Amino acid sequence: MQQIVILGGGAAGMAAALAAAQAAPAGAVRVTVLDRNPRCGKKLLATGNGRCNLSNTGIAPACYFTADPKALAPLLNAVNTAAPLEWFRALGLYTRTDEAGRVYPYSNQAADVLALLEGHMARLGVEVRTGCTVNTLSQNRNGYAVLFDSAERSNETLHADAVICAMGGNAGPQFGTDGFGTRFAAQCGGKLEPLYPCLTALQTARPNKALAGIRVKARAALLDLDRHTLLAEETGEVQFTDYGLSGICIMQLSGLLAPRRGPKRPAVELDLFPSLDEAALTALFAARVPLLPGRTPADFWTGLLNPKLGRALWAAARLPDTPLDTLPDAAWQVLANTAKHWLFEDLTPCGWKQAQTTGGGLSLTELEPSFQFRGCPGLYFVGETLDCAGMCGGFNLHWAFGSGITAGRDAVRTLRRPHKKR
């Protein structure tokens, strides 16, 4: 009996295993999953705050961060052709879509998605071995040999006619990921793009700890200070932290901070009043003074902004702490300009523990549209190991499930082709 071995039991690995088992002739192919955790899908359970944001109705190449957008196009087309949502519905999963296009299981439970995957894998005879650490992969004339340590013994060897590497990236080490997937890809001769934490909060050089926990609707723009250019902007909720800035729109911008191709001097500019232009905001500020019961800067923000945030903005504008009616008219233009262009410099992405996904990884140029490693029939790489990080909103799980399904199906189709060493 021929065998397909999947290295990693996360979203991509389970999708690959189940898709292969579905495509294989009955009794002809053994599908085996090796995972280092006590149970598959540990990280999946945490996605979408436990609700499992499966996909998005707005899937497009522009929603992914990669060093090679041209190489992404055929791979993303293959992922979309795999139709992960239709595949899940055929497994019995009913979904719902919110106003932002994010797709969730109707139950809002990531545990239900995992239970369906586990149940169908068991039904089709997929062997799942947990507590396994892969050491090496070698190629021979008959296929591949996987050397690994299991919970029972060290240096076990498993023969494989095809291998699908789904060992994840560096993000979320608390879920059992440690970057071995990308190191493994390099050991196989693959070109790696530099790794970086993606979809993460940003540290600033001089965080205002008094603002920690405050949330505000704002427009956040990522600037390249050296080139004086606007790189991207997002509108949404910004959260101030004791180390800097967070919130979904900040996390989206973090994807552009890739080594080598990202800005050398990035900065985030916040617009706290995105619905007003600067002239209208100046007029609003000036008109408030006679309306307020008090005449101090502390009174100024009542009913307008969180008072702590207002005090920080006042300080950023370098206005004196004097009665409001003593300030010149020009002060309101200065304050409005600061509120529309509040600059945060010296940015550093937070580490792997806070990152939702991994930027960089195995170059997409190394892959066929089937996710097969070029020059190595029967060897595939899928999911977060690859240089393709999606934005927040279900794009990463869509990529993980779709790449796994594509590779699993193709592995069955190519089993009888002769293996040639790269």
Residue ranges and their predicted role:
Residues 21-49:
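Glycine-rich FAD pyrophosphate-binding loop
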Residues 130-143:
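A conserved short coil-to-beta-strand element within the FAD-binding core of flavoproteins
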Residues 1-12, 32:
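Beta1/beta-strand and adjacent pyrophosphate-binding region of the FAD-binding site
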Residues 5-7, 34, 134, 157-174, ...:
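Short hydrophobic core segments
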Residues 38-40, 46, 54-61, 191-194, ...:
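An anion/pyrophosphate-binding glycine-rich loop and adjacent beta-alpha core
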Residues 49-97:
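Glycine-rich active-site loop/strand segments that organize a redox cofactor
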Residues 162-208:
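Glycine-rich loop(s) and the adjacent beta-strand/alpha-helix scaffold that form part
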Residues 130, 310-389:
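A glycine-rich dinucleotide-binding beta-alpha-beta segment and adjacent secondary-structure elements
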